[in-house]
Amino acid sequence: MDPVLVLVLTLSCLLLFSVWRQSSGRGRLPPGPTPLPLIGNILQIDIKDISKSLANFSKVYGPVFTLYFGTKPTVVVHGYEAVKEALEDLGEEFSGRGNFPIVERMNSGLGIIFSNGTKWKELRRFSLMTLRNFGMGKRSIEDCIQEEARCLVEELRKTNGSPCDPTFFLSCAPSNVICSVVFHNRFDYNDKNFLNLMEKLNENFEILNSPWLQVCNVIPAFLDYLPGSHNKALKNFAEIKSYILKRVKEHQETLDMNNPRDFIDCFLIKMEKEKDNPHSEFTTESLMATVADVFVAGSETTSTTLRYGLLLLLKHKEVTAKVQKEIDHVIGRDRSPCMQDRTRMPYTDAMVHEVQRYVNLIPNNVPHAATCNVKFRNYVIPKGTDLITSLTSVLHDDKEFPNPKIFDPAHFLDENGNFKKSDYFMPFSIGKRMCMGEALARMELFLLLTTILQNFDLKSLADTKDIDTTPVASTFGCVPPSYQLYFIPR
């Protein structure tokens, strides 16, 4: 048979199958734009600003609608009420982790963030308990953050008031806090292993936010057959895992079953206790993936928020001045900030919350999935269907936060200048899959930002009106543009 005819017939069959699958899969799914065969709605979405596209679709189809990424339907939930209903009221039903092909290639479905079922429940329960035992959200970890803040100040002083890119410094500080919990040690800022880890983490976060990776997540075959930045991400992750394995082996050689030093020790002890269980979720591969999850989630997200926060404070000098005035009044210059100060610093607390709200770090959350057939409003969501929850639609809701595109700590202050909580504040998500490092991240952001502003004035190289705070990427995460600044000792 003519090869051209074979190709035409094959493509025709694929198109027919795609059309059949999309039409038969609609059932009682929410409405949405008509998908194209094979590629779905991908051409109707701005890959560089997915949140904007979702907002436009919600105006046409309402707060719950269906998009097709390739041939697979994905339900999108938009707006506070719908997001809360999906993630809290139906938290168990939507507690599955959605499809993320590049990450599945990295960790084989292991770890905490991208695992499912019993594996996820057991590892999350163990990790939460272990992290709490090592002080997450408590005074002991606060001491660790304060010590790291002092080290950060010393490193910033070494810039001698010269212009610098803060990315490296702001990556090291939160990463070292996590290292103390996971590896039982912090690194000097010039340690070669540490520098290599920081480089790999930063590169991978940038790659995950590239438009190319969003295309690969829609058409996973590209990951296997085409060149591209995804190969660099996979190589970087392999190097990170290799380093973790090296540290695991060091821990195994010095392990004291009765005196665990850190997260790795606790996991190794759990492995030993379950060594006779052939179905145990606690294996060496699982340990490496879990440590990678804890390390990546606990460092890159906080460092990016800090970097974005300083950029916003550079642009909004009046906010910086008010925060520094409050710092001088409540803390002074002779002691380190502590978490007890926060209740007496409503404006600073509001500023930290506003940074997180404005930055909107993970705009469309990490994808969820239905663990069973779910009746959601007037629709039936089949088991295994991916769910995108728009956190942008909550954090930038103009009814809760007037002028949401403007950076303004008053969004979290009442008429008397007291701190005002908001149910719409969910940068860590909500429900069963909410970020388990929330308490740690909140402490880090408050203590590190206040310590920096206690010790330094921030000076921009450009006029404040020329400072651009628009993210350079807004796909998986929001990444601030590169910038330099002066840290001027106060």
UniProtKB/Swiss-Prot annotation:
Gene3D superfamilies: Cytochrome P450. Its cofactor is heme. GO terms for molecular function: arachidonate epoxygenase activity; heme binding; iron ion binding; linoleic acid epoxygenase activity; oxidoreductase activity, acting on paired donors, with incorporation or reduction of molecular oxygen, reduced flavin or flavoprotein as one donor, and incorporation of one atom of oxygen. It is an enzyme of class 1 (oxidoreductase). The modification Phosphoserine is found at S127. The modification N6-acetyllysine is found at K249, K375. Liver. Induction: P450 can be induced to high levels in liver and other tissues by various foreign compounds, including drugs, pesticides, and carcinogens. It is a peripheral membrane protein. Its EC number is 1.14.14.1. GO terms for biological process: arachidonate metabolic process; linoleic acid metabolic process; xenobiotic metabolic process. It catalyses: an organic molecule + reduced [NADPH--hemoprotein reductase] + O2 = an alcohol + oxidized [NADPH--hemoprotein reductase] + H2O + H(+). It holds the Pfam family p450. InterPro entries: Cyt_P450 (IPR001128), Cyt_P450_CS (IPR017972), Cyt_P450_E_grp-I (IPR002401), Cyt_P450_sf (IPR036396), Cytochrome_P450_fam2 (IPR050182). Keywords: Acetylation, Endoplasmic reticulum, Heme, Iron, Membrane, Metal-binding, Microsome, Monooxygenase, Oxidoreductase, Phosphoprotein. Catalyzes the N-demethylation of aminopyrine and benzphetamine, but does not catalyze the hydroxylation of tolbutamide, testosterone, and progesterone. This is Cytochrome P450 2C28. It comes from Mesocricetus auratus (Golden hamster).
